[in-house]
């Protein structure tokens, strides 16, 4: 009995450490959203010009997720995690030392390389290390780490950037990663690669129309979200005319609302996943369409950000659950593709927001983002009606 209890405690400790790692990786991806103005001021650039860094990061992840996953498919997972954390930490040290915007971008590319591998293996590792019968809870913990990156990571990173400079934000993330690495070295056993899939898995996955439809839905809805979200900090200050402190509070509110979305999905996701995702996309559409009208009031923007955060968490969880259900025989390949496709959406959205801000007006980012959100809503209704069973159950 004691051995089993200890074993379960150790198993949960391993999953929690992975969740902390997920928090750190997502924090570093999201945190530039709250630092764009400070970085732009530091390098004497326009905010919209600095925003291209978001697109470069996301598209490097998108481009390298599958190749890196395939290159490392036979590598023992503990060793792989240690190596990618070393790259991650070294890249953050370079971010801290960046003497030009070009060097900062190079350092972010290094982080993106580590990110590309991490997210292709994390979900399957969490499932493997979870106590018996607790796989869903293990995935929920990883999702919580992801949500907390927006709830705590991004706002804290912005606060550190405001008071100590944006370089210290990246340095602090590097320190957090170092501590997490030491915990992983201490806790993780040898983890031989399992069910990672290979190039042979790709034709099999591509022949699953339900899975391909989910991938398409993912890229469109993420593009919609990041068209506006990437520039929400300068939007709040320059368009709405509110303070930097309110921008921080708004990011905290939006991220915190993600926890509510996670709870809602945890309660209803098993039975009503498709309906939840479509409803969340509709909610995202409304939030984007009302972004500019809501900019005349702090209360209006605050309420809107709550619904926005709830919607995006449900969408993110719903997409991940469906991908895992539709590719149980090649989870690493499927999740590498998902990570790549998700980041194509991030990069595309950030680029669209960049172009709208530079050549039109930053005030229009919500309206422009609403266009792909509407397309995503229509597509979700179509595919969930066409594959109502396939999307809820595992295929073999």
Swiss-Prot record:
It is found in: Cell inner membrane. One of its GO terms (molecular function) is carbohydrate transmembrane transporter activity. Residues 36-49, 102, 157-169, 230-245, 296-298, 354-363 are periplasmic. PROSITE patterns: MFS. Its main location: membrane. CDD domains: MFS_NepI_like. GO terms for cellular component: plasma membrane. Keywords: Cell inner membrane, Cell membrane, Membrane, Sugar transport, Transmembrane, Transmembrane helix, Transport. InterPro entries: MFS, MFS_dom, MFS_Efflux_Transporters, MFS_trans_sf, Sugar_effux_transptr_put. Belongs to the major facilitator superfamily. SotB (TC 2.A.1.2) family. Involved in the efflux of sugars. The physiological role may be the reduction of the intracellular concentration of toxic sugars or sugar metabolites. This is Probable sugar efflux transporter. It comes from Escherichia coli O6:H1 (strain CFT073 / ATCC 700928 / UPEC). The gene is sotB.
């Amino acid at each position: 009995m004691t051995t089993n209890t200890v074993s379960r405690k150790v198993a949960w400790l391993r999953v929690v450490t992975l969740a902390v790692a997920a928090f750190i990786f997502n924090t570093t991806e999201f945190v530039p959203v709250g630092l764009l103005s400070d970085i732009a001021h530091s390098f004497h650039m326009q905010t919209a010009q600095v925003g291209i860094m978001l697109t470069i990061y996301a598209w490097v992840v998108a481009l390298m997720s599958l190749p890196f996953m395939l290159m490392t498919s036979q590598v023992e997972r503990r060793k792989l995690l240690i190596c990618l954390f070393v790259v991650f930490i070294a890249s953050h040290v370079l971010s801290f030392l960046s003497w030009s915007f070009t060097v900062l971008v190079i350092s972010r590319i290094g982080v993106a390389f580590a990110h590309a591998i991490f997210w292709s293996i994390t979900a399957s590792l969490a499932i493997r290390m979870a106590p018996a019968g607790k796989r869903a809870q293990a995935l929920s913990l990883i999702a919580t780490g992801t949500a907390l990156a927006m709830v705590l990571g991004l706002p804290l990173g912005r606060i550190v950037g405001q008071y100590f400079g944006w370089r210290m934000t990246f340095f602090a993330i590097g320190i957090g990663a170092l501590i997490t690495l030491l915990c992983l070295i201490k806790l993780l056993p040898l983890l031989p690669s399992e069910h990672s899939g290979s190039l042979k898995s790709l034709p099999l996955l591509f022949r699953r129309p339900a899975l391909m439809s989910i991938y398409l839905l993912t890229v469109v809805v993420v593009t919609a979200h990041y068209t506006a979200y990437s520039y929400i900090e300068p939007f709040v200050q320059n368009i709405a005319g509110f303070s930097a402190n309110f921008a921080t509070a708004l990011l905290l509110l939006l991220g915190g609302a993600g926890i509510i979305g996670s709870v809602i999905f945890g309660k209803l996701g098993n039975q009503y996943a498709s309906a939840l995702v479509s409803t969340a996309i509709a909610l995202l559409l409304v939030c984007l369409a009302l972004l500019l009208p809501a900019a005349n009031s702090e209360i209006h923007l605050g309420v809107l950000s709550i619904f926005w955060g709830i919607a995006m968490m449900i969408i993110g969880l719903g997409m991940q659950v469906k991908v895992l259900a539709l590719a149980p025989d090649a989870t690493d390949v499927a999740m590498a593709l998902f990570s790549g496709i998700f980041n194509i959406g991030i990069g595309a959205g950030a680029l669209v927001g960049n172009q709208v801000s530079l050549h039109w007006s930053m005030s229009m980012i919500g309206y422009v983002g609403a266009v792909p959100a509407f397309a995503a809503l229509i597509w979700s209704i179509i595919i969930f009606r066409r594959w109502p069973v396939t999307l809820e159950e595992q295929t073999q």
